[in-house]
Amino acid sequence: MSDLDHFDLLPIQMDPQSKAITSQNASRSLAAELEALNTLHRSLLTIEHPSGAPPPPVPVNPKRTANVTKLRDSGNNEYRKGKFPEAIKFYTLGVQMAMQRPMWEPAALVREEISGLLANRAQAHMAMQNWAEGAVDAHASVEARWVGNAKAWWRRGRCLAEMGRLEEARDWVRRGLEVEGEEGE
């Protein structure tokens, strides 16, 4: 039976003080959904806006975007100088800043920023021969953005090959070529 054909009425309660939504007989999936709802509610309460409501749709804080870009550029400069640990620090700070965007900002923007930062951090790990860390970052970059991310597909394949996982590397690069098609680098 599909989810659209079935409906269960579940008893839920709202705490009068915190306005948190709970359920007595919550399954794991319901508990996760309620936690996400309560987290969204708490983040909306922290808005510093005279009306107390979130700003209109799709507002992007230009300062945060500029700071994420500046951190990425600083990481790129350190990478070019051969200072790979410093580059990794800048990329990590950029990832952390991008992940702190409010929930109402476009998710596509966050995914774009994250995928680029993680792909660059993977390259810095590769330069230090930290193959496992590079593979993890490249994989996370691909998960954030599948199409148009040929470098991350290749970087994970290279890391897997360097770790002696040749079959996985070949399969990974093959999948990357299927996704990227003729656009792949």
Predicted regions and their residues:
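Alpha-helical tetratricopeptide repeat
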Residues: 1-185
